[in-house]
């Protein structure tokens, strides 16, 4: 995805497998415009993440960093049908009005990280809920599971950190096993959650990073590292990224979907 809401596909090698000196653009779709046409209203969030599912459909999510619910920005989750992508790659015309499908989010809800694909569908974590979505001549919401968040976290006057968290909600992309969806919430303390892939039911919940010294907060901003030994044991590693976020993310005039270090990251954190 690009910062102007397009998704591009580039050809990197020739038919013999040699790397091209200059990549060739073979697909360019304005996803935000296509999603607005499908939704019938304007989106006030920008394109954040894309991923292919197991059937070749291209899923997308709008959002950014620190999607504040009270600002009521309009966002969507959705996909472009595999058939349309194949048509474009074959040099044919594709009618996106019949190939782009969206799931309208409540104003103020949006994605803050990546999308995970499984054989069951696309798993997307917004600032308020975790979804399993499936392409079925439209977006089928198989399940939607809410989770806790205390909201955006920033350093206090006596804290031993600067900056804050990058997300308002859970902040991490979902990690998958064949049976589970795993991510952290943004409660206090932060908890690692495991959801049943089929039902979305929370089957395990455990506080993590809850033994830090006073003056340190927790914000998980990347996927949990997950290892499934296929014998009934799943192991995880969760990392604390608190302090990475720029204090400027709290500014209502900041467009948190703009991917730039100056807008997103705390410079003190980058230099340590």
Residue spans for each PLM region:
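Extracytoplasmic/lumenal domain signature
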Residues: 6-46, 51-272
């Amino acid at each position: 995805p690009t910062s102007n809401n397009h998704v591009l596909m580039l050809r990197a090698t020739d038919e013999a497998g040699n790397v091209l000196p200059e990549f060739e653009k073979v697909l360019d779709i304005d996803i935000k415009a296509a999603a607005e046409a499908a939704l019938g209203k304007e989106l006030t969030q920008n394109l954040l993440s894309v991923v292919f599912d197991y059937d070749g459909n291209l899923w997308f999510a709008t959002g950014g960093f620190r999607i504040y619910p009270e600002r009521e920005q309009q966002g969507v989750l959705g996909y472009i049908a595999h058939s349309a992508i194949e048509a474009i790659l074959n040099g044919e015309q594709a009618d996106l009005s019949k190939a782009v499908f969206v799931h309208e989010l409540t104003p103020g809800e949006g994605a803050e990280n990546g999308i995970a694909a499984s054989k069951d569908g696309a798993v997307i974590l917004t600032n308020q809920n975790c979804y399993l979505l499936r392409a079925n001549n439209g977006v089928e919401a198989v399940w939607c599971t809410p989770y806790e968040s205390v909201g955006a976290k920033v350093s206090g006057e006596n804290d031993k950190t600067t900056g804050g968290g990058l997300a308002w909600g859970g902040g991490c992309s979902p990690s998958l096993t064949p049976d589970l969806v795993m991510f952290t919430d943004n409660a206090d303390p932060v908890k690692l959650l495991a959801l049943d892939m089929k039902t979305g039911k929370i089957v395990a919940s455990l506080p993590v990073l809850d033994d830090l010294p006073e003056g340190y907060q927790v914000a998980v901003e990347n996927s949990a590292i997950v290892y499934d030994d296929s014998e009934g044991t799943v192991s995880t590693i969760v990392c604390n990224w608190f302090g990475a976020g720029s204090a400027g993310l709290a500014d209502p005039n900041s467009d948190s979907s703009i991917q730039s270090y100056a807008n997103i990251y705390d410079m003190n954190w980058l230099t340590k």
